[in-house]
Swiss-Prot record:
The chain crosses the membrane at residues 25-45, 48-68, 85-105, 112-132. Its main location: membrane. Residues 19-138 form the MARVEL domain. PANTHER family: MARVEL-CONTAINING POTENTIAL LIPID RAFT-ASSOCIATED PROTEIN, PROTEOLIPID PROTEIN 2. It is found in: Membrane. May play a role in cell differentiation in the intestinal epithelium. This is Proteolipid protein 2. One of its GO terms (molecular function) is chemokine binding. PROSITE patterns: MARVEL. The gene is Plp2. It is a multi-pass membrane protein. Keywords: Membrane, Transmembrane, Transmembrane helix. The keyword Transmembrane helix applies. Pfam families: MARVEL (PF01284).
Length: 152
């Protein structure tokens, strides 16, 4: 039993780390880190009312990262994962844009201004994530036949 666990461990580790090297894995990891930094900036300000957006988006991105890393998305087939990921990133884009504009207009304190600027950066990051995960863009098309046709 110990030999089989030892032999399967590198395969499991390879499967878990292979997603983190993809564009989507790096993007999800960057979203988590950026949400954490924004959360720290909002927590350092006098009012931390806007920090809930960072917490929720960080948790959602971490859950999707775990699901994709452990290949759980292929085992749970009743959820349409591309649309789920697209709507998560689209909603985050809209909410970060609104929150950042409100915070920058209020402009009370340097940590809130930094959080607002980082929120605009998060808007771009989540918007890019929504762009690359748009499910209709990823549909495959069948190739046209290239055989010569008999004709005049």
């Amino acid at each position: 039993m110990a030999d089989s666990e030892r032999l399967s461990a590198p395969g499991c580790w390879l499967a878990c780390t292979s997603f983190s090297r993809t564009k989507k894995g790096i993007l999800l990891f960057a979203e988590i880190i950026l949400c954490l930094v924004i959360l720290i900036c909002f927590s350092a300000s006098t009012t931390s009312a806007y920090s809930s957006l960072s917490v929720i988006e960080m948790i959602c991105a971490a859950v999707l990262l775990v699901f994709y890393t452990c290949d759980l998305h292929s085992k749970i087939s009743f959820i349409n994962w591309p649309w789920t990921d697209f709507f998560r990133s689209l909603i985050a884009t809209i909410l970060y844009l609104i929150t950042s504009i409100v915070v920058l207009v209020e402009g009370r304190g340097s940590s809130r201004v930094v959080a607002g600027i980082l929120g605009l950066l998060a808007t771009l990051l989540f918007g890019y994530d929504a762009y690359i995960t748009f499910p209709l863009k990823q549909q495959r098309h069948t190739a046209a036949p290239t055989d010569p046709t008999d004709g005049p």
